[in-house]
């Protein structure tokens, strides 16, 4: 049972890492810090809030 839980956690970490790499590629050089997907969304909302 513990092995299954560990495998699920590892898969989740790998998926999150893959998403972060995709975000860096989309920005074209990592101008935006790839700390998490939420930062990109929050930065987008800030740009709309402050014209």
UniProtKB/Swiss-Prot annotation:
Gene Ontology CC entries for this record: cell outer membrane
Signal peptide, first to last residue: 1-18
UniProt keyword list: Cell outer membrane, Lipoprotein, Membrane, Palmitate, Plasmid, Signal
Lipid-substituted positions (N-palmitoyl cysteine): 19
InterPro entries according to UniProt: Lysis_col (IPR003059)
Region (Disordered): 27-51
Lipid attachment residues per UniProt (S-diacylglycerol cysteine): 19
Keyword RNA-binding on entry: no
GO biological process: cytolysis
Top-level taxon in the UniProt lineage: Bacteria
Protein topology in the membrane: Lipid-anchor
Cell location: Cell outer membrane
Function summary: Lysis proteins are required for both colicin release and partial cell lysis.
Protein known as: Lysis protein for colicin A
Organism: Citrobacter freundii
Record gene name: cal
